[in-house]
């Protein structure tokens, strides 16, 4: 692809923030004419724009869109937005930053999506590659925007991709790709669960290796899709499976589960997916094993908060959808009462999957936020409060040694917090104050 294909072209970037700024830097280097649109009056990152970048805030500028040679869309904006559809109908190409990245990337790409676990698997595979001595670039929907990884001499890219990012990606040819699982999420954006799944399935297009979850048939590619070698992981009876507390690749044991820092059955399945991806990309067994031994998981993902009260306080604030909370509750080892904190913005999700799991005599649900009332109706053993802080204040005098307080909200945080990290940090602070 010619280096100067964007020189002098009018490029409209819709949406600023970290990703938008990475697009601005990319096109500035290509000597394009850049204009930025953001529907917010004061978008994050506005102070980093140079004077030669045209800026329109507060709305979508249709005149600018229609004058573009190329539109680069933030994943936060739906393709169905009327102004974007008008531009598409006028013959203007609309892409996302991942599409730009894959057109330029020179090293193999491992691509990871799924409703839950994708950040864990992305960081775990990256750890395996590092342990194998491979110079690896990790980013996408986690950490660093993909375009910022270019021209750094990386030998392998590991990308976490959201359904929103995949909607505007057309040229991905991953070395290895996976959909870890599919459960309802973003129902405020998609017409149905099947539309959401269809967006995820785009990750498999022209992939050399496709890794599917045999415990979740929704992760299987469509018959019409052009995919390469199919590999399978599952709890039992798959190429990558758990046998006698060992993670196995075929007939070979890779590691005993008690040698891993990651805990929980859901994380063992995440580890199986990571092993399958790593092997498909040619990461050696030593790197895979050392990665599994060293990797301790992500902040806000089933993370124990250190306290000295004998109560297990667990921050799972990254559980922003129902499937993630289901994964946290399945097989949870409990000796006392579980005080479960649920709430936030459910994004139109169906909470009924939680009903059987929370209707247990040893579980008390404290429900808060925008969808707190709907969540409280799942069980008679629930308490409805306005905020997470109120919930913890009520729980504090009740907990005793052997109990667990679990923040696994099954909802996004944006109704009461800036992001799930802020929610998790507040939980950790309140947990330590509770002692």
UniProtKB/Swiss-Prot annotation:
Gene3D superfamilies the UniProt entry points to: Mur ligase, C-terminal domain, Mur-like, catalytic domain, NAD(P)-binding Rossmann-like Domain
Protein name per its UniProtKB record: UDP-N-acetylmuramoylalanine--D-glutamate ligase
GO biological process, one term: regulation of cell shape
Any single Gene Ontology cellular-component annotation: cytoplasm
Gene name, Swiss-Prot/TrEMBL: murD
Broad class of where this protein is predominantly found: cytoplasm
Reaction catalysis annotation: UDP-N-acetyl-alpha-D-muramoyl-L-alanine + D-glutamate + ATP = UDP-N-acetyl-alpha-D-muramoyl-L-alanyl-D-glutamate + ADP + phosphate + H(+)
SUPFAM superfamilies: MurCD N-terminal domain, MurD-like peptide ligases, catalytic domain, MurD-like peptide ligases, peptide-binding domain
Cytoplasm in keyword set: yes
PANTHER family named among the record's database cross-references: UDP-N-ACETYLMURAMOYLALANINE--D-GLUTAMATE LIGASE (PTHR43692:SF1)
EC class of the enzyme, as a word: ligase
Protein's job: Cell wall formation. Catalyzes the addition of glutamate to the nucleotide precursor UDP-N-acetylmuramoyl-L-alanine (UMA).
Protein localization: Cytoplasm
EC numbers on record: 6.3.2.9
Top-level taxon of the source organism: Bacteria
Family (UniProt): Belongs to the MurCDEF family.
Binding site for ATP: 114-120
Keywords: ATP-binding, Cell cycle, Cell division, Cell shape, Cell wall biogenesis/degradation, Cytoplasm, Ligase, Nucleotide-binding, Peptidoglycan synthesis
Pathway(s) of this molecule: Cell wall biogenesis; peptidoglycan biosynthesis
Species of the source: Haemophilus ducreyi (strain 35000HP / ATCC 700724)
């Amino acid at each position: 692809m010619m280096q100067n294909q964007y020189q002098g072209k009018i490029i409209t970037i819709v949406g600023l923030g970290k990703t938008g700024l990475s697009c601005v830097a990319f096109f500035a280097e290509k000597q394009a004419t850049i204009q930025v649109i953001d529907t917010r009056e004061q978008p994050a990152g506005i102070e980093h724009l140079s004077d030669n970048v045209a800026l329109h805030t507060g709305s979508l500028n249709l005149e600018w869109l229609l004058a573009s040679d190329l539109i680069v869309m933030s994943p936060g904006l739906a393709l169905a937005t009327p102004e974007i559809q008008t531009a598409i109908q006028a013959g203007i190409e609309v892409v996302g930053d991942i599409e730009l990245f894959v057109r330029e990337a020179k090293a193999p790409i491992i691509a990871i999506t799924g409703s839950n676990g994708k950040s864990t698997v992305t960081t775990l595979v990256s750890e395996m590659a590092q342990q194998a001595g491979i110079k690896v670039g990790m980013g996408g929907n986690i950490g660093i925007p993909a375009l910022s990884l270019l021209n750094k001499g990386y030998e392998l890219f590991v990308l976490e991709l959201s359904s929103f990012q995949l909607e505007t990606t057309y040229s991905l040819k991953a070395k290895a790709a996976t959909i870890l699982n599919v459960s309802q999420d973003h129902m405020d954006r998609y017409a149905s669960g099947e539309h959401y799944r269809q967006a995820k399935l785009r990750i498999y297009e022209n992939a050399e290796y496709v890794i599917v979850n045999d415990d979740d048939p929704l992760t299987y590619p469509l018959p019409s899709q052009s995919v390469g070698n199919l590999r399978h992981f599952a709890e039992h009876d798959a190429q990558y499976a758990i046998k006698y507390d060992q993670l196995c690749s075929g007939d070979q044991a890779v590691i005993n589960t008690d040698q891993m820092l990651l805990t929980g059955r859901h994380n063992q399945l995440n580890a199986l997916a990571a092993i399958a991806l790593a092997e498909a990309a040619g990461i050696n067994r030593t790197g895979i094993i050392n990665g599994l031994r060293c990797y301790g998981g992500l902040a806000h993902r089933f993370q124990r908060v250190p306290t000295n009260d004998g109560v297990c306080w667990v921050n799972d604030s990254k559980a922003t959808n129902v499937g993630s909370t289901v994964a946290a509750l399945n097989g949870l080892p409990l000796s006392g009462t579980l005080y479960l904190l649920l709430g936030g913005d459910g994004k139109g999700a169906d909470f009924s999957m939680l009903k059987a799991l929370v209707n247990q005599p040893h579980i008390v649900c404290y429900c808060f936020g925008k969808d707190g009332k709907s969540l409280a109706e799942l069980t008679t053993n629930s308490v409805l409060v306005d905020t997470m802080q109120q919930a913890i204040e009520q729980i504090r005098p009740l907990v005793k040694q052997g109990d667990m307080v679990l923040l696994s909200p099954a909802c996004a945080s944006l109704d009461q917090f800036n992001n799930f990290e802020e929610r998790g940090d507040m939980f950790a602070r309140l947990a330590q104050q509770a002692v």
